[in-house]
């Protein structure tokens, strides 16, 4: 029984260790996540057929961005509504260029990834402001967003992943964080390619499921070791938003005219 209890706690302990990043390591993880995203979008938009190794590398981007988001929202919880407002603004501003870039691949109603973080930040803000009623309102908001987020931005699994990581990185009770750890683990396992496991089990495991789980852990572990003594940020504040919108604008323009 003791062995089983230890095994059950492995995913939670691994995820909890991943949230322990100093500011320098956070910036390195953010930079590598952006690189993975750029490679994935280049592969998706400009290569035919897709390169499976680039697809696999791209699976690390969303979990890493979610981890950085979870760490950031827990640093200044009193600013959650301000952070939500900023995310909603950037999500709306970015949506036209997202639609331009992916107009041939995703349906018109598909939302960009910033809506995931805007919705989950709004849930946390409402929960902080109004308790159970705020939590219910935030859950309803995420339920509404899940469908338009599904084609391109990970849908329900992505929402569960982000909220779960925020709980693990926060100050909730050990039991709540333990349950959140399992929710995060299950969302990671099903985040990419779960619908293809029955028909293409080997390819799905090698290029989707395992990279989604292992690559983020490898990146975070490397960042923790390389940046162990870097306790100051070295990237410009909030540089992700213009880079995200800008690369979509550039990619969309190329796709449209070429």
Question: Where in this protein do the model-derived segments appear?
Answer:
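Alpha-helical transmembrane segments and their immediate juxtamembrane cytosolic regions
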Residues: 1-258
